Structure formats: structure tokens, C-alpha cells
Amino acid sequence: MKKVLYLVAVLFTGALTLVSCDKNNNEGEGEGPLDEDVKTATVDSRAYNKWIYFKFSDGSTVEHEIEPIGGTYNGALNYSLSLPNGTTNEGSSEDQKLEISRVDENTVKITLKDFKSGNQSMGDIETEATVSVAKSKWTVKAENKDVGGYTISCDGTIESNTNINLNMSITVKAMQAMNMGPIKATYQGAMEQSANVDESTFDWDIAFHSYDKKTNGGSVLATTEKEIADVTTIPTGDYIQDIKSDSLIVNMGGMMDENIGIGYAQGSVNEVLSAATLRDLSNMPPLYSKTDLVYIVKTKSGEYAKIKFTDYMDEEGNKGVFTFKYVYPVK
């Protein structure tokens, strides 16, 4: 009789153990992988004049200002020099370098590199100029600036695609004493090297500029799921890479004045990731929205991240402050 009771007790205990194990194995069904570490991050991307770079592995950020017109240009320079006898000496250079560097928000330095008038080398010709936006183009202007042995005036425009058109008047004081000059010059060229930060010098995965977003050599796919846990495998499909854009808004000061307009810069954007949070400027005030979808970011190293934007404003209602959940790396 004792043996029978002992056998019943063993069987009953085993049954309880099986029930308990089955319950543990079923926990989390339908919620995705149990070992996923879902992190939350917030990026303040309200500034128009900078990119905020985000790193998935540690959630760190770094920011760098956008320089819309600074850099080295290459173009054609045509000039004429008035001579004492009333004639002109004309010349041109097809590969003339010109540099623009930022002094402050409203001032740049323009340097005509190694300028030659005929066989005479005049070295670098430089002047400071004011910079502003007019009809959505960057304008530069300097009037009778005395720089060493020169007096320089210039005015021109730089478009968002970084094509430059510049008129210059250079009075060389030594030539003026001999009734020569001024030198009248026109310059047309395009930027060949931007003054913006070299993005390959630091680690980052995605970046934010206002409502624009881009990747560091990666690509993005939008899923149809609205919960991170519901994306249980890395989906296949068309992962979209970044594209070049010359319509990054960096100056909104003249948005309501058609004679001023918006200041633009060149850059790259990922249209898929940017569409996760939208801002419609066709009417005022702007309309804001988000898709609630989960996005897959394939990084340059070949790893994957799941990301879902949960808000586009902070607790005070400031728009352009993005909160998102993400999993990285996706296992």
C-alpha cells in the first residue's frame, strides 16, 4: 500500500512539473524574441543649421553645423584690365580656384587663389563679404574693401546646387598710380570640396536634420508592422539607400517673404526613414504627422536595427524633438 501511495505522489509531482515548464515556455508568445533589448532615445533636431548624428551601439550623439556655401570652387575666370591708352588687356583662366570660408553667421571670406593677370602673378586676392538669402539663393557682397594693396568689390549668388556666379572689381593700388585698372572679372564655377565636416572621421549610424534623416552608408526598409516585437525576422525587400539633395533647409528667416525665401544646402537624405515623421509646409501653421511603422535600418557594417518613432515633440510641445524605440543589433 505504501508503494502505491509513493508512486501516486511521484506521478502527481511530475505532472505539476510538466505544467509549470509548459507555462514558462509559452510566456511571451506573440511578443517577439524574449531576449530583445528595446532601448529608447530622444534627439532634439529643431535646429536648421546642424546635423545630429546618432550611434546605435551606445546611444551617443554628436552634432556638427551645416556649411551651405563654404568650400573650394573650381571655375572659369574672365577678366579685363583697363590700360592707360584707353584699351583693355583681356584674359581668362579655365581652372581658377576660389575658396569661401565662414567668418560668422553673416560674413564669409572669399579668396581668389593664385590670381594671374597676363604673365604677372598677383598671388591670393581675398576679401570679406556679407552673406544673406535673396529669392532662395545665397548672395555675397563686398563694397570697396581695402585689403593690403588692393581695393575690392564683389557681388554674386550661390545656388543650392553650389553653382557660383560672381562679379569682381579689383583695384591694384600700384597699378592705379600708373593709370591702370581696375580689373573687372567674372567668375562662374561649382564647388568641388565642401567645408562641411568629414563624416568618415567619427562613428555614427543615422543622423537628423530638422525633419530630414540619413544613414551612414546604410539603407532602410519600411515594414507593415506597428510594433517592434511583431518584427520577428529581418524582412527581405527593397532597402533604399540615401540620395543626394540640394533642398536641405538651413535658413527659414525669409520663408514668408518671396524676395528673401528659404536658404538651402546640399546633402544626402534617406527618403524612407525621413517619411517616418513628416512636416507639411504647404499651409501655415505646418502639419505634423508620423507613420507609426517599424523601420529596418541596414548599417554600413551589415548589421540591422529595428526602429519605431513614437513622438515628434517633447513634453512642452516643441516639435522636432524625436523619441524612438530601437533594437540593435537584431539577432
Region roles according to the model:
Residues 136-155:
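An anionic, turn-rich surface loop/hairpin at beta-sheet edges
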Residues 24-109, 142-147, 175-331:
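Surface-exposed, beta-sheet-biased, low-hydrophobicity segments with strongly acidic/polar composition
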Residues 96-101, 124-135, 153-160, 189:
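Extended lipid/amphipathic-ligand handling interfaces
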Residues 6-11:
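Sec-dependent N-terminal signal peptides
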Residues 17-20:
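C-terminal motif of bacterial Sec signal peptides marking the signal peptidase cleavage site
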Residues 1-5:
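Positively charged n-region of N-terminal signal peptides that target proteins for export
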Residues 157-160, 165-174:
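A composition-driven surface/loop motif
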